[in-house]
């Protein structure tokens, strides 16, 4: 009998679909990258999704984030994502956390309950804490490196953190992983050189902040706000979603 996952089953088979339906994945960061990862996982039939993000949809998110529309501005991203997931498949179990993941909040999560962890957050301290906790729990993790200030979505690669180049965030993560004797870390990164944003005081977030009321981490406190677009972060998020699905089912690509 056909269902909404019939076309995916044609590629993966029934056993793999059952594996996906029985899997639980945590996505940390529901923004330009993580939002599209969630979309891919939900449409692929992952049975349980944990969404972690304390941010609200801002008008400036409309250029790239799948959770952002005029109607959702001011709403929590995890709430918007949960509704979207249930519009896709009401049977997916969704757990939301309005939490900014840091070393101080990390103990609120039991990483042994996840089949896979996705890091799509944008602070080094949070990213490395997330990696350490996942590694300690023996839970597979994939991390997004920098997707801002870039224009070419074809430059993304999936590799180990120690094989990365060009990306400034990856360079910092390599150093932090070495300090903690982390031997391997799967990442998605871009080999495209980082662009320098075209500064314009008339659209400066620091001078004209429009973060929704109640936003905990306003752009006024950020050292810099990277340029972004609709077609680079989204591709990174979809690549990550694909890697998670393939890893969960043990997909072996055809040679040739």
Please provide the spans of the model-predicted regions.
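N-terminal charged helix/coil linker that caps or initiates catalytic domains
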Residues: 1-26
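Glycine-rich phosphate/adenylate-binding loop
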Residues: 2, 112-113, 126, 136, ...
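Conserved N-terminal Rossmann-fold NAD(P)-binding element of oxidoreductases
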Residues: 27-29, 52
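Hydrophobic/small residue at the entry helix of a nucleotide-binding pocket
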Residues: 33-34
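Glycine-rich phosphate-binding loop and adjoining beta1-alpha1-beta2 segment
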Residues: 46, 51-89
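Acidic/polar active-site rim loop that often engages polyanionic ligands
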Residues: 60-67, 149-160
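Conserved SAM/SAH-binding loop
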Residues: 98-106
